[in-house]
Structure formats: C-alpha cells, structure tokens
C-alpha cells in the first residue's frame, strides 16, 4: 500500500497559502484518480483511497502532522518506504521541484513532526515556494498567499507535481526524479 501525504494547515484561512501547496497536490490527485473519502476524523485528517493507494491531508495543523501520519501508517501497516510526503520548501526557488528519500527537516516543522513520529526514510516531494528576505519573516511568509504573478503558475505547477506523484506509483524514484525535477518555474513546459 502507498500513502501520499500533503502537508498543510486546515481551514479556509490557510487554503491558498504557500504552506498548503501539499494539500493542493493531494486535491489534484484525488480528483484525477477518483479516490473516495474514507474518513474525515478517525485519522486526524481527510483520508482518501483508490485500490491500494491512500491520500492524506492531516487536519492536526502543520506542526503536529506526524501524529496523523503515524496513525494511518500503523492502522494500514504501511512501510516507511511507501510513504510519499509532498511539502513546501523555502530553500528552493518558486516552482522548483525536487525528490529525495530521507534527510533532515531543514527547519520545516511539519517534517520535524513526521521525523519524530515515523522516522526519516520516507520519500519527499519538495516544492519551492521562494524565500523571504529575512529569516525572521519565515512564519509570516509561508502563511501568506502566493504573489499575483506566482498565482498564475500554481495550477500548472500542481498538475506537474501531481503527474510526478502518479509516476511514482509505477516508476522508480530515480527515473521520476530525472524526468520531473525542476530548477524553477521556468523549467515547466
């Protein structure tokens, strides 16, 4: 069984923020694949399923998302290497897309929570959301909407990452990485 997790914060207040790009990708996957909702509360998140693939949007808020993922992992007996986490990354320029297995949390509180609850060897799909001018602005930056110019590219970016995630269901990580990685939004056709 494969588990895709999109990191984000619940509620309309956060819906279109940089931190919620993972939720947007999960929504795209669920729509594209016709996955059905199997739980809104039992796993501290919205959980969807089609065949042997699960899609999770934790509703615990970003900093506690590891709890939700751990619950789903244990209930469905999912191996760590079969978990794919989609998240924002301020260390990448807007529109960059990177894939990797394991690694540190890089200051991302959602990843910090995951690492504490399930370990580090899951696959990460990192989506660049740009970086604020000063480190002290990070919390405000990720909790705000994309710029008007960036908003115009979000749909294409989300579709690209969604397609990459679908490829991960049948292709190996290195092959997906070589085909779908982007240095910035300019690399998106």
Curated annotation (Swiss-Prot):
Pfam families per the UniProt record, alphabetical: Pept_tRNA_hydro
Name this polypeptide is given: Peptidyl-tRNA hydrolase
GO molecular function, one term: peptidyl-tRNA hydrolase activity
Active site annotation, chain numbering: 19 (proton acceptor)
Subunit structure and binding partners: Monomer.
E.C. number: 3.1.1.29
Site (Stabilizes the basic form of H active site to accept a proton): 88
Annotated localization: Cytoplasm
Keywords: Cytoplasm, Hydrolase, RNA-binding, tRNA-binding
Residues holding tRNA: 14, 61, 63, 109
HAMAP family per the UniProt record, alphabetical: Pept_tRNA_hydro_bact
CC terms in the record's Gene Ontology section: cytoplasm
Principal EC category: hydrolase
UniProt catalytic activity: an N-acyl-L-alpha-aminoacyl-tRNA + H2O = an N-acyl-L-amino acid + a tRNA + H(+)
Role this protein plays: Hydrolyzes ribosome-free peptidyl-tRNAs (with 1 or more amino acids incorporated), which drop off the ribosome during protein synthesis, or as a result of ribosome stalling.
InterPro entries membership: Pept_tRNA_hydro, Pept_tRNA_hydro_CS, Pept_tRNA_hydro_sf
Biological process terms in GO annotation: protein quality control for misfolded or incompletely synthesized proteins; rescue of stalled ribosome
Top-level taxonomic group: Bacteria
Site (Discriminates between blocked and unblocked aminoacyl-tRNA): 9
Keyword Isomerase (UniProt): no
């Amino acid at each position: 069984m494969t588990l895709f997790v999109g990191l984000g914060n619940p509620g309309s207040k956060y819906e279109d923020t940089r931190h919620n790009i993972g939720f947007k990708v999960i929504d795209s996957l669920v729509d594209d694949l016709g996955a059905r909702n199997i739980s809104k509360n039992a796993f501290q998140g919205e959980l969807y399923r089609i065949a042997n693939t699960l899609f999770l949007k934790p509703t615990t808020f970003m900093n506690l998302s590891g709890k939700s993922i751990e619950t789903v992992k244990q209930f469905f007996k999912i191996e760590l290497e079969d978990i794919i986490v989609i998240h924002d990354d301020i260390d990448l320029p807007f529109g960059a897309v990177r894939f990797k297995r394991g690694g540190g949390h890089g200051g991302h509180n959602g990843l910090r929570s995951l690492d504490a609850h399930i370990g580090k060897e899951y696959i990460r799909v990192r989506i660049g959301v740009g970086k604020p001018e000063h480190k002290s602005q990070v919390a405000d930056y990720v909790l705000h909407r994309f710029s008007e110019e960036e908003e115009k590219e979000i749909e294409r970016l989300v579709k690209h990452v969604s397609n990459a995630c679908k490829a991960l269901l049948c292709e190996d990580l290195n092959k997906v990485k070589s085909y779908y990685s982007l240095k910035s939004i300019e690399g998106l056709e």
